[in-house]
Amino acid sequence: MKKLLTVVSFFLLGIILSVGCKPAPDPMLDMLDTQMSSLKKDDLTRTMEFVYSENRFDQGQFQDKVSSSLNRWAQVDASEETIDSWTLDSFAKSLIDQYATLPMIERTEEISYLNSDAYYLQETSWMNQLTQRIVATPNPKLFEIYRLAAGDFETEGQEEDLLAAVMKRIHPELDAEQATQLAAAAKVFDWVTRNVQLTELVDLSDEQVEKQRLNPEVADPAASGTPGAGYQHFPWQVLMFSRGDYIERAKTFMVMMKLYGLDSVMLATKSKGEDGEMVETLWCPAVVVGGEYYLFDTRLGLPIPAGTPVKMATLSELKKNPDWLAQLDLTPEESLRDDTKYWVTADQLDDLVGLVYVSPESVAKRFHLLESKLPADQPLNLTSQPSEMIKRLPSKEGLKMKAWNVGFETHAYRQAVNEAVKKANEEDVVRNKLSWYFTNEAYINDFTLYRTARAKYFAGSFETVRGDAKANAIELFYALMYDDDKIRSLGSDQGLQRLLGIYEEDSSLLEFRQRIESVQAQMSLVRRDAGYFLAECHVDNGNVGTAINWLDRLRATPGDNRWEGGVNYLLGRCHEARKEYETAIGIYENDQKSPQFHGNVIRARMLGQLTGSEVSAEAAPEIKPAPSDN
């Protein structure tokens, strides 16, 4: 199947590059623009309507529309505005200086907007809406392991925040507000763990680096377009693609914590490298609640336990009880793999670094002005003041703070990728280096309906509103599960063509045929993802039984196993939610190929300790890849 996928991807690559024509005007974008004009909305209000809309648009036209509208607003409506209080944050200045040649950074002190600013607005809107939804939704079934740790706490009839009540029992040292905050952090962390399938860190040899480098004239890995750990995707892309390494999970979680109102830092350990220089290794996010740093390991997919199952460790407690880290090693009975040791040791706790996430947009003058002028019914937390946050952070012995450059690295990397994509049609070497882009991203960027379904999922659009003809997320993902007949019919089905943004009258016959072939190739990739996202919808909507049916179906369907780790983990979580503990434990322990295997085994261990469950042969079926069709 992997061979087949490669063929499809390179076919798609060739079609996309050969079409070469300017896309037809996005009718949905034009319709919304016309509607806003008729209502005499000002440029800023109209811009935010585009950003907040659940409907997604042609990517290029969306960013052009948003940036041009913002610049028009800045020149006309905001031309007399001043923000004398703005100064470049002192804590971020070193990063601004380091990346001064990036177009994004060159405008830090200007009131003018770039095309890429549209995606930052979209990212903040999505993550703000998503964070509020996650925190507000009880969904107690998903936190069964916490309920068990709270002494088999009975949640029926509870009117308060159920997880906050559970947290108060597990952590009696917290007051009610702190328990609510820790519960919110746990909910968001759990959502990120379930919805961002963990991928392995990119670890290239020197030879591989030279082969992957998109711009051989640039030495910096990110700026040269060389894939690397943590910086390949913006947080909004991590959400859209539903995949990321543990660093990308971490920064996504930390941005959501900021939007909720909690401070966090990324902890890093220090050790000597082969050349004798000190090397920092990223570890885990630490969220501040009640003056303490609570540790959430995005590689494990679990908070660091405080010696007993599920109870969350603080950094202060861990330093007093460093043996807790050794309890995260896997035993020979649990795994015979070589990498059974936990990746942080007790001696590393004495010299930690706290990295403060900073995005270049959040400290820019233009976004400070924009945030202050947003309509009252369209507020967004677009800015940050890292130097003020540093003052708020608890002072702990041995923890030194510094600005984290990963947000700047992502901009540098994506600039290199975007420039390379423009050259791919003419340069075979560049085109071959970008095969990952056309396999994993291009079809999503070009498929508006796919992105609309994802946006509706982030918003929690699961129910059909009476009298509203708009499809919800579940209905859209169903619609995206195209069968072979539907894909073949695209060439003659004008209704489907228009739904997917194909208009014969706007192109030559050759361009039209190439566009049909391109979208047909995309449809075969889209349906692979839609089934998995449909299961995610049902889990978020509390229908774990329905989710199990879909996940079992996905495991039995021939495919390239792109979502294998996520499917198995989500399936285990669903059985855990239904109190089918032995089945859940068996799934966690047997998914040997998952990058999250270590954490899944720790989860299985804790679940077994809390329930006294043992895995039977029937309850722990071997996890096998979906059958191949080649």
Where in the sequence are the language-model features?
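Solenoid-like repeat scaffolds
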Residues: 516-525, 552-562, 589-597
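"A position-specific structural signal for the A-helix of alpha-solenoid helical repeats
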Residues: 529, 533, 563-566, 570, ...
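Secondary-structure boundary elements
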Residues: 50, 64-241, 280, 290, ...
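Hydrophobic/aromatic-rich core segments of domains that either
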Residues: 166-196, 201, 223-230, 236-341, ...
